[in-house]
Amino acid sequence: MSNKKKVILGMSGGVDSSVCAYLLLKQGYEVEGLFMRNWDSMLNNDFLGNENISQDICPQEQDYQDALEVANKLGIKLHRVDFVNEYWNDVFKTFISEYEAGRTPNPDILCNKYIKFKAFSDYAFNNLGADYIAMGHYAKVTDGRLYRAKDQNKDQTYFLAQLSHEQLKRVLMPLAEFSSKEEVRKIAQEQDLITASKKDSTGICFIGERKFTKFLQNYIPMQPGDIVDIRTNKKLGKHEGCFYYTIGQRKGLNLGGQAEPYYVCGHDVKKNILYVAPSSDLSYLTSDALLATGLTLNHDDFDHNNLSAKFRYRQQDIPVTIELLPNNTIKVYYPSESQAVTPGQQVVLYEGQKCLGGAVIEKIYYKGSEKTYL
């Protein structure tokens, strides 16, 4: 009987997880792949905005075929599991209810917390006898603690910050030390893997590319209302539904005849009003503090005087100070100010290379006053 440690690898049919399979084999693990099916367009009424609905083979099925071909090439077993119900209940219902409340959720964060590192890991450990699970994320995990990847451009710790130390204790991230995606593709080419030049997946986690406003209309009916200048309270036009617009958005407002472009600065969901402000006045987007809830901290030990944060993916870190409050609540102060910090999104805290954790943004402040129009 083999004394090799068994790793169950999330295989998506993309180049990252394909190369992970090769690397883990090379490192001496017993490797098996697990492909997740998390979305069913027919069952989930996903018709509007879905350009794949009439294709002979849906992208998800093509991904499975690619993962299978890679698994066969590397001589490993590929399992397939269906988490459509879990995704709907734990990720998508929250996603929709947040939009209905006029907030901007991040499905990738929910997806990692409840699917990849909960449903997937439970299945791998309980059904497939895994010692470890592995994922093709660009992030570093050491002893269950989360750190930034070497490739800062691809670093995905922002999406993993809600994971607990417990969830990460038996996780391997083989791509942590790569300097660029090109290095990963080069290995795939050298090993003649079918996914070597496959494009990165984009769009909503496990759902894919959609025409977003149309896609939301499958689940949230259109509710046209007034677009109002927040400074003058003057009606400037009509919107299709508050839920379809995000804070800071400039395109798609159809406000012709104005002296300058406008941007979305807030909404009143109950009154169905979309608030806008002119581009020359960014004060309505600016904030210097926030309150966030549901804080998960992955590191216990950190220097309170050397913290930075991101409020959205790929944003440059900005220096912050924090105030830890009861009930996993946190106040974050950023005196250098930031724009378009949005309720429903996540604040992620860092100390150098350490990703300390994250929380969901609830309230935004500027010069001591809450911005209630968000």
From Swiss-Prot:
Site (Interaction with tRNA) location in chain: 137, 345
Residues annotated as binding ATP: 10-17, 36, 136
Reactions this protein catalyses: S-sulfanyl-L-cysteinyl-[protein] + uridine(34) in tRNA + AH2 + ATP = 2-thiouridine(34) in tRNA + L-cysteinyl-[protein] + A + AMP + diphosphate + H(+)
The UniProt record lists the keyword Disulfide bond: yes
Principal location class: cytoplasm
Enzyme class: transferase
An example Gene Ontology CC term for this record: cytoplasm
Region Interaction with tRNA, annotated ranges: 154-156, 312-313
EC numbers: 2.8.1.13
Disulfide bonds: 111-205
CDD domains: MnmA_TRMU-like (cd01998)
GO biological process: one example: tRNA wobble position uridine thiolation
Any Pfam family hit: tRNA_Me_trans_M
PANTHER family, alphabetized: MITOCHONDRIAL TRNA-SPECIFIC 2-THIOURIDYLASE 1, TRNA 5-METHYLAMINOMETHYL-2-THIOURIDYLATE -METHYLTRANSFERASE
Protein name: tRNA-specific 2-thiouridylase MnmA
Organism (species): Mycoplasmopsis agalactiae (strain NCTC 10123 / CIP 59.7 / PG2)
Name of the coding gene: mnmA
